[in-house]
Amino acid sequence: MKQYHDLMQHILDQGVKKEDRTGTGTVSVFGYQMRFNLQEGFPLLTTKKLHMRSITHELLWFLQGDTNIKYLKDNNVSIWDEWADENGNLGPVYGYQWRSWPTPDGKHIDQITNVVNMIKNNPDSRRLIVSAWNVGEIEKMKLPPCHAFFQFYVADGKLSCQLYQRSADVFLGVPFNIASYALLTMMVAQVCGLQAGDFVHTLGDAHLYSNHLEQAKLQLSRDFRPLPAMKINPDVKSIFDFKFEDFTLEGYDPHPHIKAAVAV
């Protein structure tokens, strides 16, 4: 995916050195955007192998409103282990905000249900938005949302999605985020009777950790391979009815995985 390689090269060429919360240090740029046409293949990196199973399970976990890692652990997904407490809880993170945003009068807002209904009934709305950035609950979260806010857009029978990501771990996190939101866009499009359009990824602080620079250069040296296709069970009509078995990745032939440490 040239868009992603261009981002990494831009950071290596133009980035500034910054300190960060984890103490690792980064090379960073501010404000960057990528666009992926979902009709041209599923945007899963081919220049290193990614674990699509983890991405899919995490997205299904978000959509169920879950904030305990038990479901992930039961499915051999460990990407949230470093942040969970001794009981597996993460506080009111993504799934809670997506499905149960608390209101001052003690009620809760299911943003996912609301946005799907709005897409179906008022597709030209400019309010097709879901936010995970709840200022009043940031301190309760084990990790504040990195991918904080997304908006849908309907035109010509296609559903597009733009994500704003405040903090972007470009080597490890961003490839997961691209695939996750591309899949979410396809799922929402299906249940709304639309085709998938574009996924637009807007980054705030886009950074390579200082211990990922050599891995990034190795990845940049690799040739692109054809993008895979993601097949979704067409019988699923509700965004909350999807199961892991409803997704089939076809034609994925990536270069080998590149190991890199997670900054916690």
From Swiss-Prot:
Main subcellular location of this protein, as a coarse class: cytoplasm
EC code: 2.1.1.45
CDD domains in the record: TS_Pyrimidine_HMase
Enzyme class, broadest EC rank: transferase
Gene3D superfamilies for this protein: Thymidylate synthase/dCMP hydroxymethylase domain
Entry-linked Pfam families: Thymidylat_synt
Organism phylogeny: Bacteria, Pseudomonadati, Bacteroidota, Cytophagia, Cytophagales
Positions that bind dUMP: R21, R126, R127, R166, S167, A168, D169, N177, H207, L208, Y209
Family of this protein: Belongs to the thymidylate synthase family. Bacterial-type ThyA subfamily.
Full protein name: Thymidylate synthase
Involved pathway(s): Pyrimidine metabolism; dTTP biosynthesis
Signal sequence annotation: none
